């Protein structure tokens, strides 16, 4: 039995297949691996008579942490630490940096016949839909610190929280400390 058909046969009804990417620059062709695997699973579920929804998230609220070599460093260096959705597009073809690079990648989806429902994390954060989950994580930060220690042996300080917030003054997300 094909591996995806096995997954579909073992699955319950109403499955959500989800993948995501941080568009910090040109997306490497290797990132298509997850896209194709998730698409195959979604198709196998549907072929097997299961209800399935294929989602693809764009983590555009992650910070710009480096300027790719193919971009103008002088233009983009001032945006280091800003959420990708708040960094200008390399040209006028997109509203911002994240949409520019995701647009390139999503064009490849079309050529492959992969059609997930695409969502942007900026929209989830700004709409407040994640607020209750953020609150839960902040209230249980000690458990998240314990998980980091157990899984990756990474010790986080007691004042570390599993959340990055944009500074109200400078707009950066990478250097702001939650308190």
Labelled PLM ranges:
Residues 25-26, 62-65, 126-129:
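Short catalytic/ligand-binding loop motif for oxyanion handling, primarily in non-cytosolic enzymes
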Residues 29-32, 96:
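Alpha-helix capping and helix-loop boundary segments enriched in small/acidic/polar residues
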Residues 55-64, 121:
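Short, solvent-exposed turn/loop segments enriched in Gly/Ser/Thr/Pro and often Arg
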Residues 61-79, 133-134:
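Charged, often glycine-rich, active-site loop that binds/positions anionic groups
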Residues 83-179:
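Active-site neighborhoods of enzyme catalytic cores
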């Amino acid at each position: 039995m094909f591996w995806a058909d096995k997954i579909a046969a073992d699955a319950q009804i109403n499955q959500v297949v989800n993948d995501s990417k941080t568009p910090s620059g040109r997306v490497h062709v290797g990132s298509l691996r997850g896209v194709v695997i998730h698409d195959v699973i979604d198709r196998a579920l549907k072929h097997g008579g299961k209800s399935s929804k294929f989602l693809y998230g764009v983590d555009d609220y992650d910070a710009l942490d480096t300027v790719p070599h193919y971009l103008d460093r002088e233009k983009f260096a001032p945006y280091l630490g800003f959420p990708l959705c708040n960094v200008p597009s390399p040209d006028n073809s997109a509203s911002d940096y994240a949409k520019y690079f995701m647009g390139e990648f999503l064009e490849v989806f079309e050529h492959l016949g992969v059609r997930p429902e695409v969502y942007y994390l900026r929209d989830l954060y700004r709409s407040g839909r994640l607020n209750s989950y953020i609150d839960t994580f902040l209230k249980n930060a000690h458990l998240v610190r314990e998980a980091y220690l157990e899984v990756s042996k990474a010790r986080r300080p007691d004042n570390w929280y599993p959340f990055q917030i944009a500074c109200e003054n400078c707009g950066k997300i990478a250097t702001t400390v939650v308190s």
